[in-house]
Amino acid sequence: LNVLCNNPHTADCNNDAQVDRYFREGTTCLMSPACTSEGYASQHECQQACFVGGEDHSSEMHSSCLGDPPTSCAEGTDITYYDSDSKTCKVLAASCPSGENTFESEVECQVACGAPIEG
């Protein structure tokens, strides 16, 4: 999921012309006048960037998100996992996997678990 999907568009373009661009609005992409550097040129481009496989999966949670978080261990590495209490993805330093609740990156965790994308 592209972090630009959560960026709001602005009305002030500093004398640049506004054009119709597409922005994520909930579970779809809608057109709105914006600066040329914002949003996406087409609805398809917006959907491909903002939704897994072009579809909204925000209400679905991958089963690995519900597993046990990693545990601390001496020979471990930084592991990203889903924290079901805070409903966010976190990184635990010097940890070892203790189940399926491990992800290659924070973005992968956020997409799989429906956690908010920050940025």
UniProtKB/Swiss-Prot annotation:
Residues 1-53, 61-116 form the BPTI/Kunitz inhibitor domain. The keyword Repeat applies. Keywords: Blood coagulation cascade inhibiting toxin, Cytoplasmic vesicle, Disulfide bond, Hemostasis impairing toxin, Protease inhibitor, Repeat, Secreted, Serine protease inhibitor, Toxin. Residues 54-60 are annotated as: Linker. Disulfide bonds join 5-50, 13-35, 29-46, 65-113, 73-96, 89-109. It is found in: Cytoplasmic vesicle, Secretory vesicle; Secreted. GO terms for molecular function: serine-type endopeptidase inhibitor activity; toxin activity. Tick salivary thrombin inhibitor that plays an important part in the anti-hemostatic strategy of ticks. Is a potent and highly selective thrombin inhibitor (Ki=10 pM). Has two domains of the BPTI family. The N-terminal domain bind to the active site of thrombin, the C-terminal domain binds at the fibrinogen recognition exosite. This is Ornithodorin. It comes from Ornithodoros moubata (Soft tick).
